[in-house]
Structure formats: C-alpha cells, structure tokens
Amino acid sequence: MSVSSNASSASNKDSVDSPSSTTNTDSSELTHILNRRQEIMESQEAGIEVRRTYKVVNVYTDFPEFSRNQIKDYQKTFNTYDTARDGFLDLQELKFMMEKLGAPQTHLGLKQMIAEVDEDNDGKISFREFLLIFRKAQAGELDSDSGLNQLARLTEVDVEQVGVSGAKNFFEAKIEQQLRTNKFHDEIRAEQEERRREEEERAQRRQQFQQRAAIFQ
C-alpha cells in the first residue's frame, strides 16, 4: 500500500472548501484512512475477525418506504464518505461529511448524531443505520435544527455540483417552507380553538338563560 497513491486519490476529490482548509482537511482525512486501514490489517494478521461491510439484511425490504433508486442514491452517498471502506461511518468520517455538506458539527454534536441511530451501540453508523436517518426525517421525527436533519436535507442536493452555498440555500429554503407550513397550521389551529371557545360560551349562555327562565316558571 502506497501512502503517496492514497494521497493522490484523496486530492483528486472535488472540493468545495477554501484551498487552505481543504489541504488541512484532506491531510487529516488521509491520516485517518491510513490509520483505519492499518488497524484492519493488524486485526486480520492477529486472527481477529473484522466486521465487514454488510450485515445479513435486505434494506430493500427493511425500508419499503424508499424506492430502489433512492436506496442506491443513499448507498452512493454513504460510500462517498466511508473512506476506510469498512462499511461504517465513524466519528471522523461523519465529521468530514458534515464539513463537506457545509454544516460542521461539534464533537459532542457528532456523538449525538451517531447515538440517535446507533442500534448496536458500536459508536459507528452502518448503512442500515444511515437509512434510519432518512426514515426519521421523512416521518418528521428529527428536530429541525439537529445535525441528522441537516444531513438528511443537505444530501437531497448534490453538493459537488451546486457547491456549499447552493446546498445551504436549498436547505434554508426548505426550512423557510416548513416554517411557513407550520405557521399556516398554527393559524388553523388557533382559528379552530377560537371557534371552540365561542361555541362553549354560546352553550354556557343558553344554559344560564334556561336556568334563569326556569326560576320564573
């Protein structure tokens, strides 16, 4: 394995960051890739089983709400950031992904993102767990300002094509649209609540009138 060839491969990736930040990020990412691959090789040499890319699951049947094309797109995105090629996104890979999406997270924020979908508590995100992010987003189970929600929304566009600013504009437009929708629903609920109060008041006035009328009968 050649470090120079890996470095060349890493530098060929399109970048949406500034030259200086990209150099630092790529260098850190390359170091992480090499360290992770070294860990895998040492484990295999020591006779320790290394968990491979996929569990025995069928994501197409486990996630019927997504079409095959959607799942293939999610797989492509997952593979892009699974730089160690071990079938998981660890904290460093997730950090790199969020930076590329233009939504960098704190260390604690990244750990919280992983914990929210980490079914087997291994501290990493498998592809199945990655799909859980989009299931939760589709079901409205993610906080609008959470890291996972940002990940789900930002991956709806191709950041490599539109750039970080374009993706952020898309995400902000989505948020604004949702806020408008929520405001509309709030207004409807307020009107319904007002009508309910008016009906209760009318019913109460009728009852009071009937009670007073009964006194004079």
Curated annotation (Swiss-Prot):
Protein residues bound to Ca(2+) 1: 82, 86, 93
Question: Can you list the GO cellular component terms from the UniProt entry?
Answer: mitochondrial inner membrane; muscle tendon junction; plasma membrane
GO terms classed as biological process: mesoderm development
> InterPro entries attached here?
AIF-1_EF_pair (IPR049025), EF-hand-dom_pair (IPR011992), EF_Hand_1_Ca_BS (IPR018247), EF_hand_dom (IPR002048), EFHD1/2 (IPR040365)
- GO MF, one annotated term: calcium ion binding
**SMART domains in the cross-refs:** EFh
**Keywords in alphabetical order:** Calcium, Metal-binding, Repeat
- Point to the regions of Basic and acidic residues compositional bias: 191-204
For Ca(2+) 2, which residues are the binding ones? 118, 120, 122, 124, 129
Disordered: region residues: 1-29, 191-217
Low complexity composition bias: which ranges? 1-28, 206-217
Q: Which residues form the EF-hand domain?
A: 69-104, 105-140
Q: Which PANTHER family match?
A: EF-HAND DOMAIN-CONTAINING PROTEIN D, EF-HAND DOMAIN-CONTAINING PROTEIN-RELATED
- Report the protein name in the record: EF-hand domain-containing protein D2 homolog
Gene this chain is encoded by: Swip-1
